[in-house]
Structure formats: structure tokens, C-alpha cells
Swiss-Prot record:
Keywords: ATP-binding, Cell inner membrane, Cell membrane, Membrane, Nucleotide-binding, Sulfate transport, Translocase, Transport. It is an enzyme of class 7 (translocase). It is found in: Cell inner membrane. Belongs to the ABC transporter superfamily. Sulfate/tungstate importer (TC 3.A.1.6) family. PANTHER family: SPERMIDINE/PUTRESCINE IMPORT ATP-BINDING PROTEIN POTA (PTHR42781), SPERMIDINE_PUTRESCINE IMPORT ATP-BINDING PROTEIN POTA (PTHR42781:SF4). The lineage of its organism: Bacteria, Pseudomonadati, Pseudomonadota, Betaproteobacteria, Neisseriales. NCBIfam families: 3a0106s01. Its EC number is 7.3.2.3. This is Sulfate/thiosulfate import ATP-binding protein CysA. It comes from the Bacteria. The complex is composed of two ATP-binding proteins (CysA), two transmembrane proteins (CysT and CysW) and a solute-binding protein (CysP). Gene3D superfamilies: P-loop containing nucleotide triphosphate hydrolases. ATP binds at G35, P36, S37, G38, C39, G40, K41, T42. It comes from Neisseria meningitidis serogroup A / serotype 4A (strain DSM 15465 / Z2491). It is a peripheral membrane protein.
Length: 357
């Protein structure tokens, strides 16, 4: 089922929570709403579900206007951060619950319900826990059961509101991979709310980055990461260091270093800030003009990566090198490094003001 949102607005008193939201979610895709707390992502999810009413705009499911339809008529499945399993029911009965309370005309037979629950427990790899109760399960197992319960009624749309937020990092990572596989197998249109950049980048077909009730950028995980459209998206999608330079004659200049800008944009001569991610630095060759010359303050090797903190004037700059690259150079505290970037994301001062976090 495809989702189309047109000019959606929502106020809470004087607070404008959603501002003219326009969004298309293609059939069968897993789309993440990504942004900081208070950006409007959960409000948007609740309006799509029918749990909250919009002040203006439309919501279309497969081209049909459902803006005024009750949540029960939207055929939506939910998975929340807090599993909301029934403590007095075992795993089997929790998964079966949605089927047992359907109107009699729509309710499957007991045999069909049993077959469906067994199928779903096999899908989430927890068949052996059918007779267990929620308090006997780990957090990851409870969340798998919550997803199985949501899928039991065969929703046309699956909504997930920070489903892994209450779990520890290792379990979250395992469940992200598992969710991606489940979605690939079932193909149900899904919308995931998260503030976790890594989670969104790992599981999503498309990402919708939100801030202050607006959509900042929509695209594939790779496009969002590789081609951020503004300073907010650049900063929000991972660690960066910022350098204030100047645009002149199609180049961004900083400290004698020049970075050629994309010719398709008409860059005006102005002050502009360049953002560089830790892994997008490299050590300058002898014939290259470095962007910065900095003293190493700390070195920390983690597996195949070497994390380096350098001091550039009063600014701390974070560098991440592959272990093989770091081994070719005298990387040690107190040594100096000449560094050039492999990629610089440049934004004007006006953009920085408009998209400040």
C-alpha cells in the first residue's frame, strides 16, 4: 500500500508541530522518519495511524483519502518502544489476540488462528517460547513477539515507533538486521520512527530527515549520507568538524587550501563553512598543500581503525584512518600531521542560520 501525505499541518496550542508536510511512501518500502526529539516524527506517525488528527492537509492510502477515517478502518499494525504485551497471556495468546477480537464475520477459525500464530512464531524464530509469559522473555524476544502480534492481522501498513529504543546496543544491532530481513520477506509497507542515525541508515529503503516540524531531505540512505542538502542534515547524520572559510571563483578556500565546488551550483563569493567527517581525512603527500597542519593529542586503535584527535589552533579535529593507512605514518602523540580532506560539504552562512540545530 502506498502512502501520500499532502500539505499536512498540526498545531498544539501555539506550537506548530508539523509544517506543510508533503511525502510519498511507495508500496512495499521501509521508510524511516529520522530526526531529533521534538522534530515532529512521532506526531506524523500518529496522524498516519489515525491516533491523532491533523489541522489541515490530506492522507491517502493507495490514492484513497483516509484523513477522516478511524484508526480501526486503516488496517495498520503498530510496534512501540514499550512492547505492550499482555502480562497475563502467554506468547501464543499474545500473538493471537488481534485475530480473536476481530468481528465475527472477519474472524478466522480456531484452526486458522493456530496455523497463523505458528507461522508467525516460526518467522520471528521463537516457536519454542509459545507457552512462555512476557516476564520470562528478554527485551529482544518481547519486541519480536510484539512484531509478530502486529503482523497477525495482516496489516497493509506497519508503523514502528522507536521499537528498539529500550534495548541495549548489541541487541539493537541484531534486531535491526532481523527487521530488515523480515521486511524483505514480507514486503509490507513500513514506516519507522527513530532518532538513531545508524539504525535509519542500516534498515531503510528511504530516509526522511525532519527538524522543527519540517522535512529537510528525503532520499535513499546512500543519497542522504553522501549528498546532504543542508547543514542540519550534514551535522545530524554523524560526527563532523566545521571550518569557516570563504567561497571565491568556484572554490572554497581555507588556510591556503582550495576545494573545488560543484560547478552546477552558482556559488556567490561569501563566507561559508566546510564540514568534514572523521573518515574523510587523509594524510597529505609531500607535493600537496595541506588544509591543516595539526599536532596529535590522542591515538586510539579500535580493531581495523585508528582514531586520532589532533589540535588545530584551539580546535579539536577528529580523524579516523584505516589501520593499514595509519601504519604507513609515524602516528604518535606529539607528532604533527599534514592533512587534506577527501570530501568537504560546504554551506553558506544563511543556510547555517536557517538550519541550526
Amino acid at each position: 500500500m502506498s502512502i501520500t501525505i499532502q500539505n499536512l499541518n498540526k498545531h498544539f496550542g501555539n506550537f506548530h508541530a508539523l509544517k506543510n508536510i508533503n511525502l510519498n511512501v511507495p508500496t512495499g518500502k521501509l521508510v524511516s522518519l529520522l530526526g531529533p526529539s521534538g522534530c515532529g516524527k512521532t506526531t506524523l506517525l500518529r496522524i498516519i495511524a489515525g491516533l491523532e488528527n491533523a489541522d489541515g492537509g490530506k492522507i491517502l492510502f493507495d490514492g484513497q483519502d483516509v484523513t477522516a477515517k478511524h484508526v480501526r478502518e486503516r488496517k495498520v499494525g503498530f510496534v512501540f518502544q514499550h512492547y505492550a504485551l499482555f502480562r497475563h497471556m502467554n506468547v501464543f495468546d499474545n500473538v493471537a489476540f488481534g485475530l480473536t477480537v476481530l468481528p465475527k464475520s472477519e474472524r478466522p477459525s480456531k484452526g486458522q488462528i493456530r496455523a497463523k500464530v505458528e507461522e508467525l512464531l516460526k518467522l520471528v524464530q521463537l516457536s519454542h517460547l509459545a507457552k512462555s509469559y512476557p516476564h520470562q522473555l528478554s527485551g529482544g524476544q518481547r519486541q519480536r513477539i510484539a512484531l509478530a502480534r502486529a503482523l497477525a492481522v495482516e496489516p497493509k501498513l506497519l508503523l514502528l515507533d522507536e521499537p528498539f529504543g529500550a534495548l541495549d546496543a548489541k541487541v539493537r544491532k541484531e534486531l535491526r538486521t532481523w527487521l530488515r530481513d523480515i521486511h524483505h520477506n514480507l514486503g509490507v509497507t513500513s514506516i519507522l520512527v527513530t532518532h538513531d542515525q545508524e539504525e535509519a541508515l542500516e534498515v531503510s529503503d528511504e530516509i526522511v530527515v525532519m527538524n522543527h516540524g519540517k522535512i529537510e531531505q528525503t532520499g535513499s540512505a546512500e543519497a542522504i549520507y553522501r549528498k546532504p542538502e543542508n547543514a542540519f542534515v550534514t551535522e545530524f547524520l554523524g560526527e563532523t568538524d566545521a571550518f569557516e572559510g570563504r567561497i571565491e571563483k568556484g572554490f572554497w578556500h581555507y588556510n591556503g587550501f582550495a576545494w573545488k565546488l560543484d560547478a552546477q551550483y552558482k556559488w556567490q563569493e561569501q563566507t561559508a563553512t566546510g564540514y568534514i567527517r572523521p573518515h574523510e581525512w587523509q594524510i597529505a603527500a609531500e607535493h600537496e598543500t595541506p588544509m591543516i597542519c595539526a599536532e596529535i593529542e590522542k591515538v586510539h586503535a579500535v580493531g581495523a581503525l585508528t582514531h586520532i584527535l589532533v589540535k588545530h589552533g584551539k580546535q579539536d579535529v577528529h580523524i579516523t584512518l584505516a589501520g593499514s593507512d595509519a601504519a604507513r605514518y609515524p602516528i604518535a602523540e606529539g607528532k604533527e600531521l599534514n592533512l587534506i580532506p577527501k570530501q568537504v560539504y560546504v554551506f553558506s552562512q544563511n543556510e547555517l542560520i536557517e538550519y541550526s540545530i
